[in-house]
Curated annotation (Swiss-Prot):
One of its GO terms (biological process) is cell migration. One of its GO terms (cellular component) is neuromuscular junction. PANTHER family: MEMBRANE-ASSOCIATED PROTEIN HEM, NCK-ASSOCIATED PROTEIN 1. Plays a role during growth of the oocyte. Keywords: Cell membrane, Membrane, Transmembrane, Transmembrane helix. Component of the WAVE complex composed of Hem/Kette, Scar/Wave and Cyfip where it binds directly to the C-terminus of Cyfip. Its main location: membrane. It is found in: Cell membrane. It is a single-pass membrane protein. The chain crosses the membrane at residues 989-1006. The keyword Membrane applies. This is Membrane-associated protein Hem. It comes from the Eukaryota.
Amino acid sequence: MARPIFPNQQKIAEKLIILNDRGLGILTRIYNIKKACGDTKSKPGFLSEKSLESSIKFIVKRFPNIDVKGLNAIVNIKAEIIKSLSLYYHTFVDLLDFKDNVCELLTTMDACQIHLDITLNFELTKYYLDLVVTYVSLMIVLSRVEDRKAVLGLYNAAYELQNNQADTGFPRLGQMILDYEVPLKKLAEEFIPHQRLLTSALRSLTSIYALRNLPADKWREMQKLSLVGNPAILLKAVRTDTMSCEYISLEAMDRWIIFGLLLNHQMLGQYPEVNKIWLSALESSWVVALFRDEVLQIHQYIQATFDGIKGYSKRIGEVKEAYNTAVQKAALMHRERRKFLRTALKELALIMTDQPGLLGPKAIFIFIGLCLARDEILWLLRHNDNPPLLKNKGKSNEDLVDRQLPELLFHMEELRALVRKYSQVMQRYYVQYLSGFDATDLNIRMQSLQMCPEDESIIFSSLYNTAAALTVKQVEDNELFYFRPFRLDWFRLQTYMSVGKAALRIAEHAELARLLDSMVFHTRVVDNLDEILVETSDLSIFCFYNKMFDDQFHMCLEFPAQNRYIIAFPLICSHFQNCTHEMCPEERHHIRERSLSVVNIFLEEMAKEAKNIITTICDEQCTMADALLPKHCAKILSVQSARKKKDKSKSKHFDDIRKPGDESYRKTREDLTTMDKLHMALTELCFAINYCPTVNVWEFAFAPREYLCQNLEHRFSRDLVGMVMFNQETMEIAKPSELLASVRAYMNVLQTVENYVHIDITRVFNNCLLQQTQALDSHGEKTIAALYNTWYSEVLLRRVSAGNIVFSINQKAFVPISPEGWVPFNPQEFSDLNELRALAELVGPYGIKTLNETLMWHIANQVQELKSLVSTNKEVLITLRTSFDKPEVMKEQFKRLQDVDRVLQRMTIIGVIICFRNLVHEALVDVLDKRIPFLLSSVKDFQEHLPGGDQIRVASEMASAAGLLCKVDPTLATTLKSKKPEFDEGEHLTACLLMVFVAVSIPKLARNENSFYRATIDGHSNNTHCMAAAINNIFGALFTICGQSDMEDRMKEFLALASSSLLRLGQESDKEATRNRESIYLLLDEIVKQSPFLTMDLLESCFPYVLIRNAYHGVYKQEQILGLAL
C-alpha cells in the first residue's frame, strides 16, 4: 500500500525555485557546449583529429553500446580525453539528474491534485510553467548538439579503458540521448500523466493573454500607460486584481502557450478559448526563443510534430494559415507597437522627471511600459536575425529594420535611471502602504476566515506582523529591507491552499489571494527594485546578437535625428552581466570582456563622430577667419577701383567675389545650411555624451565626456601642427599672425562645445598649447615650436647670411634689399614685431626659450670655429696685442694675419643671430606685459635690485626666459661653457686674442663695397652693423666664463684696439681700403651704444666723436646721391 502524501511536507515551492534556477544553469552549459561543438576553432581537439576519425565514426554508429576493444587509437590518450571531455560529460549527467528531479516534482504535484490558476496562485503557476518550458527547451537544445554522441561515447570509452568498467550513469545517459533524437515526441509521451495540471495552468492564461497580445490601436483606445488620460485618479495608487500578471513578459507567455500545447495538444479541440490564444501566439511570430539566440522556426516544427498524428490535418492547416498571417502582418503589428511605446515611454519619463513623487502610486506603469518595450525589442532582434523561410515575392523586410529603435532603448534607460534615482521615494511610499493599508486589510480578511489550519495560520500571522511592523523611519535611516522570507511564505501558502484536499482553498478566497499578490509586488519595490528592473527591462540579449547591436549603433550614428539617443547602446552593455549564471562560471570572463570591449568601442566612436563634426565646423570657421585677413581685401579694392574708373572688364567680376559675412544672409530660416545641420548634429550628439557622467559596466566606470576630451585634445594638437603648413621640401610655412588667427578661430569653436557638454575645455587648451611650446608633444610628434624653430634657424637666418636680406634697426625687422623675386619669400612678413608677437603668443616663453637655445647652439659652433682661427694666428695676435701703440709694427703684423675675412664673416653671422634673438625677446616682453604685467614687473625688480653672485645669475636666467635683456646672456654663457674644456688655463688668453683679432680686423670691412651704411634702414648692406651685438654678447659671455671679473677692462682694451685701427684707416692713402670708411666708423659708435660696459665718454677719449658725426652726414648724403633708398 502506497504511503499517503502530505503536501505541507513536500516543499513544492522550494523545489520549484531551485529546479528553475538549476534548469537555467544547465541550459546555459548545454548552450555553450552546442556553440563550442558547432565551431571548429572551439570544439574539443579530439573530435577533429584525423587519427581518431575512424574511432569516432565507430562510436557514433554503435552508440550507446560501444565495444572498446576495437578502439586501440584512444588507448594512449585516454587520460587526456577524460580530462578534456570531463566537463562536457558531467554537464550531460547533470541534465539527466535534472530530468529525474523534474519528473519527480511533476508527479508529486499531480499526486497532490494541485490546481493552477495564474490569477490566484501566480508564483506557483509561473514557476511551474517556467520549469516546463525550461525542460522542453533543454531537450530541444540537447537534440541540436552536433557531437553529443561522439563526446559521450569517446569519454565513456576512455573511462572504461582506464577503469576497466563503464561509468555507472552512462547506460541511462545514452538512452536519454537516443530517446530525445526527436524531443517533442518523447516529451509529449512523458507529459500524458501531467495533462490535468498543465491544462489548468494553460486555461488560466486565456484572459491574461488576450489582454496583453493586442495591436497598438487597442492600446491607444484603452489609454494604456497614460497618466494624464484620467487626471482625477492621477494621485491614486494603481490596484488591479492581477498585480503580478501586469508585467509578465509576453514572450514568456508565448512560450508557455506554444510549448505547453505542444505537450498537451488534445486541449486544442476541447477548449475553444485555448485554441484562440494558441493561434494568436502563432500569428504574432514565426520564431520562438529557446535560449538566448537559439530559436525555433515554430510553425515548421509544429507541422513536423503533427504530421504523424491521425486526424490533425485541420490543425496543420491552421498552423500554415497562422504562419502566412505572421509573415504578412506580424512585422507591421510589432512596428506599430514600438511606435506607440516610443511616445508612451517618453511621456512617462517626462512626467516622472517633473513629478518624481508619482513613482510611488504609479510605479506599476513604469514596469508595464518597460516590459512591453523589452518584449518588442526581443521580438525585433530574433525576427530580424531569422527572417521567414518562405518570403512573399516582392515583399521586403523593411518592417524588420527600425531606425527609431535607439529612441525606444533610450526611454527605457531613462525610466530605469529614474527608478534607481528615486528608489527612496518609492520605498517610503510602499512602506507606508504596506503598514497603513495592506496590513490592516490583511488583518480584516484573516479575521473573516471561518477555518484556518495551524500551519496556514502561523504563516498568515507572520505575513501580517512583517507588514504591520514597517515604519518610515527605517527608510530615513537607510535600513536594508529583506522581504524574501515574506514572499517565500506566500509561495508556500499558495501550495498549501491549491492542493485538492486543502482545508483552506485558494479559489474560495480569491480576494485574499489578490491582496497578498499585491503585497508581494509592494515588498519587491521596497527591497528588490534591481531584480524587478532586470525582470522587466533586461536587454542582455544584445550580447548574443553582436552584429545587429553593432549595426543599430552605427545606423543611429549616421542618422542625426536619433543621435541624442545613442547613449543607450553603451548603457545596455551594463546589462550583459545579468545573463551570466553561477553554474557556468567559465563564460563569465568572455561576457565581461565582450561588454567592456563594446562599451569602449561605442564611446570612442561617439567621441570621434563629435570630434569630426567639431573639426568640420572649425575648418569652416578658420576659412572665414582667413577671409577677414587684410591680404584678401586687395581683390575687392581692385574691383571697386575699376568700377570708379568704369573698367567693365574688371567690374563685371565683382559679383563673383564673395565677401566675408555673406554666409549670414538668408532668404528664409527654413533653408538649413551645411553649418546649421552640423550644429544640429553636434547638439544632438553632445546631449548623448553629456547624458550621464559615467557608464558603469561590471566593476569599471566609463566617462563619455573624458572620451570626447581626449579626442578633442588629440585632434586639436594634430590640427595645430597642420595649420602651420610646413613643407619640408619647399621650406614654406604659414605666417605666425595667420596661424594665430586660425588658432583663435579654432579655439572659439571649441569654447562653444562647453555649451553642449560639461567638459573643461580650458584644460584641453592648456594641455595642447603647453605641449606645443615643447620640442615634441606627448605622442612624440613635432610641435609648432619645433617647426618654427627649424624654419627660423635653418631657413630665414641662412637666407640672411647668404645676402640680399638686411636687419633694419629702425624697422625692427629683416628686410630685402634685392629686386622682388630674388628671395623666395618676403622676410619682413615673418620677422617684424607683429609676426614675432604672434609667434610668442603661440609658443610662449617655453617655445621662445627653445628657439633661443637653438640659436645659441649655432653661435657656439661659430665661436668654436673662431677659436680655431685664433689658434692658427696666436703668435701674431699676441704681438698685435702688445704693439697697439706702434703703428708700423701693427701694420706689418696685420699683413701676417690669416683668415681675416672668415673671422669677420662669422662675427657677422653671430651678430645676425643675436639681433634676431633680441627681436624675438622684445616681442615676448610685449606679449608678457600684456598677459602678466604684474609678474613681469616683479621679474624686472629682481633683475635690477638683487646683489651679485649666484643670486644675480638665477635672476638673469629668469629675466632671460622672460625676454628681458641682461648684461651677459646666461643662455649664451651656458652654451659656450658646455663647449669649453673643463681644465683649460689658456681659455682666457684665447678670448683676449679673439677680441684682438676682431678689433684689428674691423678696418678691413671698409674695403667691402657692401659695407655701405643705409640710413633708411639704419644698417649696413652686408649686416656689418650686427657685429656690434655679436662683439658685446660674445666677449661678455666668454670673459664671464673665464671667471676673472675683467669684462669691463677687456672691453676698454677692445675699444682702444679698434679705435686706433680705425684712426690708422684715416691715414690710409689707398682709395680701395677707405671705400666705406665712414660706414665702418658708425660700427664703432653702434658697439659703444649697445655695450653695457662702454660709455660715450670713453669713446670720445679714444676716438674723436666729430669723425662719427661727420660719418653720419656723409653716408646720408651718399645714399641720396646713389638713390639707394628703399
